[in-house]
Amino acid sequence: MKAIITVVGKDKSGIVAGVSGKIAELGLNIDDISQTVLDEYFTMMAVVSSDEKQDFTYLRNEFEAFGQTLNVKINIQSAAIFEAMYNI
């Protein structure tokens, strides 16, 4: 399983640490990561994977709830969606 995680919110310390900790807690591996601050806003994109089958509804709910604790918006989408878009 491969997925794309995006994080957007007002910049503050601890966002990368918190999100990467949650990724590890959910049994996902970070394959690639990029983050930047645009004006006062933090943005991050990570490619994550797992050898095990993952329930995307569960992951989506977990990241949504966790994002609220950091006051950021966290999204997770299957990488297969992006691969299908470019293989038409």
Swiss-Prot record:
Pfam families: ACT_6 (PF13740). Residues 4-77 form the ACT domain. SUPFAM superfamilies: ACT-like. Gene3D superfamilies: 3.30.70.260. Homodimer. PANTHER family: UPF0237 PROTEIN MJ1558 (PTHR34875:SF6). Belongs to the UPF0237 family. This is UPF0237 protein SP_0238. It comes from Streptococcus pneumoniae serotype 4 (strain ATCC BAA-334 / TIGR4).
